[in-house]
Amino acid sequence: MREIVHLQTGQCGNQIGAAFWQTISGEHGLDGSGVYNGTSDLQLERMNVYFNEASGNKFVPRAVLVDLEPGTMDAVRAGPFGQLFRPDNFVFGQSGAGNNWAKGHYTEGAELVDQVLDVVRREAEGCDCLQGFQITHSLGGGTGAGMGTLLISKIREEFPDRMMATFSVVPSPKVSDTVVEPYNATLSVHQLVENSDETFCIDNEALYDICMRTLKLNNPSYGDLNHLVSAVMSGVTTCLRFPGQLNSDLRKLAVNMVPFPRLHFFMVGFAPLTSRGAHSFRAVTVPELTQQMFDPKNMMAASDFRNGRYLTSSAIFRGKVSMKEVEDQMRNVQNKNSSYFVEWIPNNVQTALCSIPPRGLKMSSTFVGNSTSIQELFKRVGDQFTAMFRRKAFLHWYTGEGMDEMEFTEAESNMNDLVSEYQQYQEASVSEGEEEYDEEAPLEGEE
């Protein structure tokens, strides 16, 4: 089977990761200690994508938990699913990274990284046919951002032909933890552009908006936000965990979603989003799911796709849905909103189906879109970065850990390049492409 090894780094990564494992354990009929007491064979059929079967009908997640301070780990261990994880797979330091990317990437993190890689190697050796890695982390902190990206590049070196998917929590415009977030995020994006195959961008502000506007929660907790993220992660990974009619794996997703290697930053959405008490008052239909899924208010990253165009997108439907209805609806969405899809990639909406819905729902859909409007997110971080970097504010925290200013300049220009690449493809049209092609043709002959 095609296994996935999961890494969670830093406080944010560990909390999202814990929520994810809680969600999928429930879907696969596992209790808090990993013992199977489900009812359906379908739950067991592809269990080993994420779980390793131990003795006594107990399943253990293929998860590696990493942090530079013991606090979050203790919280996970004390939580409802703390006994699920293999004790050797908790790898933590004592010092903390203090929201400093350089500490996570170069000093504190670098000391711990070999220990983590040993655990990753052991997990990979326990797989029949490893398809890739997924990592949950935030880009604004020290450990998740700095050490997370260090791990990604080390794993890339050792497993160059395996997929690398990241679920990255991007700093949001209004909700900020620390003042150096723009630095940490820019340095991280600089790494992700080169080393990740697919990055699912999530941001806290969009999650807050969804909680307040759609779920009618007055003061959402991080628990509520993480619950949303875990719903999306569970949706994106459905096809990998359950037999479906249209199965996909991380690589197929990437092939369908990434038209140019650098442009692999996706927006995600989930439907149906209904407040906790209101589930029983409405029936969900495929048209409703489709409409809600493509609604900008449902996107979990604070950029509005109406300001850009979709290069590609993918929808994963779960539950008892008719294939034909889904196809019709998706075609319908494309025809109605054709201006939001680039016309030089025909059929750029891909659909996958899985017959098993998430717990408590009849059907659901998860949306993954590669939209040029994600540049807003990078622009926003870039502007904040520039404002601080121009004055060299807070730089001594980074140079003190041995970083060079050059690295900041490089990261900044790499992010600006990324923004302009998105812009270039947003404006490209079919006819333009043909003319360029004709001009290039003779050159090949000359070579």
From Swiss-Prot:
GTP binds at Q11, E69, S138, G142, T143, G144, N204, N226. It is found in: Cytoplasm, Cytoskeleton. SUPFAM superfamilies: Tubulin C-terminal domain-like, Tubulin nucleotide-binding domain-like. One of its GO terms (molecular function) is GTPase activity. Residues 432-447 have a biased composition (Acidic residues). Keywords: Cytoplasm, Cytoskeleton, GTP-binding, Magnesium, Metal-binding, Microtubule, Nucleotide-binding. Residues 424-447 are annotated as: Disordered. GO terms for biological process: microtubule-based process. Its main location: cytoplasm. GO terms for cellular component: cytoplasm; microtubule. Belongs to the tubulin family. Tubulin is the major constituent of microtubules, a cylinder consisting of laterally associated linear protofilaments composed of alpha- and beta-tubulin heterodimers. Microtubules grow by the addition of GTP-tubulin dimers to the microtubule end, where a stabilizing cap forms. Below the cap, tubulin dimers are in GDP-bound state, owing to GTPase activity of alpha-tubulin. Dimer of alpha and beta chains. A typical microtubule is a hollow water-filled tube with an outer diameter of 25 nm and an inner diameter of 15 nM. Alpha-beta heterodimers associate head-to-tail to form protofilaments running lengthwise along the microtubule wall with the beta-tubulin subunit facing the microtubule plus end conferring a structural polarity. Microtubules usually have 13 protofilaments but different protofilament numbers can be found in some organisms and specialized cells. This is Tubulin beta chain. It comes from Venturia inaequalis.
